[in-house]
Design a protein with these regions (language model features):
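Bacterial N-terminal signal peptides that target proteins for export
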Residues: 1-12
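Short stretches within intrinsically disordered, low-complexity N-terminal or propeptide regions
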Residues: 14-16, 44, 61-63
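N-terminal propeptides/low-complexity segments immediately following signal peptides
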Residues: 25-59
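N-terminal maturation segment of proteins
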Residues: 48-638
Length: 638
């Protein structure tokens, strides 16, 4: 699944999205103590009265019924805390709230790069973690235990991240606060522009942009003093991004988009007021902030950037990268282990691709075979309709075969649709949008029908398995039905699990009757090869001392990617260290757990039951997935 901008925002905001609750545990104990004292006194009073002779002339008064206090179970207490936590976290992080569809804070933009906010986030996390751990996991089971484990793990991870000064690196070409602001303010993102209140909300929120940009500059200056700066190649790419946003007038600005699309039913007086207000805001507040940021990067930041590539070149960089690897893969694998695994997988997959070349009687080495697969006209669809028909036919074949491997009850419908023309240029070959549970709309597998030579026939089967059935559509469709999960789990997710499942789904092609054509099998192998190369290159850059040029050369020598694509991939790994490892590590963990279950259960192994066990609890960290699958194996043995 290609990363959407909103998902990138969620990843980047993870460092500032923290936890909080004022925990009344001691107060509860005091209340219990008071209740016990009152009851003891009442009993003592009754005992004294009972020593007096009873009066036979008066009937005894009936004692009042004592209402027993409601005692909540641990699971109930935690459920309440999780709900309170979610509300508190959205209040702390208004941007995250907006991306989750929560509109209460659409007018707020805190300075989430400031020292004060970092301290507030730390206090938040510490308080919430203490409160949840005070209840403890004893006696919990099922989803309640999983929620506890995930919550505590995430909170401890957030606290561990504080030792690394990521706040000194607030901008790169991949995560860029300037781009976040323009996506929201242009009307193309999560910020709504439907009512007068919506327009006023953005007007108030945008007041925080200059302070946020000023703080980014302050933080980068601190990084320059501490030797914590970005690689020069990344910041060179930021300048043209800013140039594309900076405009001479409000009307030429991307921020003018909401004014171009004012609702027709908005009162004329409001239209005039909002138009004038937005013009002043864009020209006198937003654009000056962008120009100041661009000027700082060009004249101060860029000259101070480093020529080295990976995190290991920074102070405490090895430990920093090891943390990023644990956070991304949700496992205890070391960079060295992942690097070697990547080398082994690259060699294995290249051997498989060579076998395909022999099978189709191709004469030439691997680079020539790669070029043939990319350029031969037999692999090009002749029309948009032919491309769509191919995917729809593929959908029918897969859905007919998938009950052999999956219990399919409750899976939402899936539509195959072309990408809208206005999105086509930037969209991937295929992508997935989950169904809307509120109006019973289906999930959508979007097919990019533009630039047909870039959509070869041989990529279709593995792409549909990954994005559609049984990939993201099954995984996210099932997770969406878990309405009793705490919101931090329903609206969160682990990349290693989500994308690992997508890659694992690709590996099921032959079991589902696909990859019979060797060229289609090549498509699967080529995707798997790229994900394995990521293991080598990401760890090479950040823990093995590789240069950027060395990483690019490795990709060019070992895969079919173009130089342009190789440069973009390598710069992505430099910008978000460790993130690209999650895909392959997740797939390999799911495959290893299946192999373990097959080995230990023998003829009792049921692949449908295994897949249900993997998916039934939603997205979980890989270490927790391993624990729960191993418990399932033990149960099946019993």
């Amino acid at each position: 699944m290609p990363l959407s901008f909103s998902r990138l925002l969620s990843l980047a905001m993870a460092a500032v999205l923290s936890l909080s609750l004022a925990a009344p545990a001691d107060a509860a104990k005091k209340k219990t103590g008071k209740a016990q004292t009152s009851q003891t006194r009442a009993k003592a009073g009754k005992a004294k009265k009972s020593t007096k002779p009873a009066r036979s002339t008066k009937a005894k008064a009936k004692p009042r019924a004592v209402v027993a206090p409601v005692v909540q179970s641990k699971a109930q207490q935690l459920t309440l805390l999780y709900d309170q936590y979610w509300d508190a976290s959205l209040k702390l992080n208004p941007l995250q709230a907006t991306f989750q569809g929560e509109s209460r804070y659409n007018d707020q933009l805190p300075n989430f790069l400031s020292p004060a906010f970092r301290q507030q986030s730390h206090d938040f996390t510490t308080l919430w973690l203490a409160k949840v751990e005070a209840i403890g996991p004893d006696g919990l089971s099922g989803q309640d235990l999983l929620s506890y484990q995930i919550f505590v793990r995430d909170a401890r991870s957030a606290l561990a991240a504080e030792q690394f000064p990521s706040w000194m690196l607030p901008i790169n070409q991949f995560y860029n606060i300037a781009s976040i602001a323009v996506v929201m303010g242009s009307g193309t993102g999560a910020q709504p522009f439907n009512t007068v209140k919506d327009y006023d909300n953005w007007s108030r929120r945008a007041l925080g942009i200059p302070d946020l940009f000023d703080q980014a500059i302050t933080n980068m200056r601190a990084g320059m003093q501490a030797g914590v700066v970005q690689p020069k190649a990344l910041m060179e790419k930021v300048l043209p991004q800013l140039d594309a946003i900076i405009a001479r007038s409000a009307e030429e600005s991307l921020f003018w988009g909401p004014i171009r699309n004012l609702p027709a039913d908005m009162p004329e007086a409001d239209k005039q007021r909002i138009t004038a207000e937005y013009k002043r805001m864009i020209e006198f507040r937003i654009m000056p902030a962008y120009r100041a940021l661009r000027g700082f990067i060009a004249t101060e930041s860029l000259p101070a950037c480093r020529d080295t590539a990976g995190l290991a070149a920074l102070p405490n960089g090895a430990a920093w990268y090891a943390y990023d690897v644990r956070q991304s893969t949700t496992s205890d694998l070391t960079p060295a282990q992942i690097h070697q695994t990547g080398l082994d997988e690259v060699a294995r997959l290249q051997g498989e691709i060579q076998n395909v070349a022999k099978q189709v009687k191709f004469r030439g080495n691997l680079p020539k075979f790669y070029k043939f697969m990319q350029t031969d006209k037999r692999f090009v669809f002749r029309s948009e309709s032919e491309l769509l028909d191919a995917y729809r036919g593929l959908q029918s074949r897969v859905q007919a075969a998938v009950p052999r491997l999956f219990a399919t009850q409750g899976i939402p419908a899936l539509d195959v649709r072309p990408v809208e023309p206005q999105r086509a240029q930037a969209a991937a070959s295929g992508s997935y949008m989950r169904p809307n549970p509120h109006d019973n709309t289906p999930g959508i597998f979007y097919v990019n029908t533009s630039n047909l030579p870039a959509r070869p026939r041989w990529e279709g089967e593995s792409l549909f398995l990954h994005e559609g059935v049984p990939g993201h559509h099954y995984q996210l469709g099932l997770q969406q039905q878990l309405t009793d999960l705490p919101k931090f789990r329903r609206f969160g997710g682990e990349t290693a699990f989500i994308e690992g499942w997508g890659l694992y789904a690709e590996s099921l092609g032959r079991e589902l009757g696909l990859y019979q054509d060797p060229y289609n099998y090549y498509g699967y192998l080529q995707n798997a090869l790229l994900r394995s190369i990521r293991l080598v290159v990401d760890t090479g850059l950040h823990s093995q001392g590789w240069t950027r040029a060395q990483a690019i050369d490795y990709m060019l020598q070992n895969s079919a990617v173009t130089r342009e694509d190789a440069e973009a991939e390598v710069d992505r790994y430099l910008a978000i260290p460790g993130q690209a490892l999650a895909y392959k590590v997740g797939e390999m963990k799911i495959s290893q757990l299946r192999e373990q279950a097959q080995r230990e259960l023998g003829p009792r192994f049921d692949v449908r039951a295994f897949h249900t066990e993997v998916l039934k609890d939603g997205s979980v960290p890989l270490e927790i997935l391993q624990d729960k699958v191993q418990r399932w194996i033990a149960t099946q043995k019993g």
